[in-house]
Amino acid sequence: MCMIEHIPELVKAGVNSLKIEGRAKSAYYVAVVTNAYRRAIDEYLQNPDGKVSPWIVEELNKISHREYSTGFYFGTEPGQVYSNGGYVRDYDVIAVCEEYADGVATLSQRNRFFKGDTADVLEVGNQPYSVTLNDIYDKDWNPIESAPHAMYLFMTQLPLPTCGVTPIFVFSLPVRSAQCELRSIK
């Protein structure tokens, strides 16, 4: 179920809290969904006649999810999607920020990436943005081409976050798999 494009209806119905459904959702999933809905609600409150920003919908399509519907909210079919029980997963989390100081982010690798990859960065309360990982270093500031294994700590320079709080950066890349390539060909 995805109601991001129906925030006006939810507000007018008196809904004052939302719940993320499902078991074993990742921290990345929760961060993206929470950020997206917070921004969509804020946009609606600032401009009740406007539409949700396209980037918000795009972000929800990047996280691992089953095919979206509005469920039974509008009382129309299909309330439940049966066409494919599998998950849509086009992006992988590649790193999570463990520490940030003086323009340097210390990151913990989650999935494989390489120097020169362009990654999306999720920052609390803001629209995600892209950075190219041109310069990555090990903990001793030796240049590296990629982090060699999961949970490996590495560093890169990043612009000062705009969120005004201790940043939580999550980096994601399009999935590099035969499944993703097949999906894009169709």
Please report, for each region that a protein language model flagged, where it lies by residue:
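Surface-exposed amphipathic alpha-helical tracts and adjacent flexible/coil segments at the periphery
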Residues: M1-V175, C180, I185
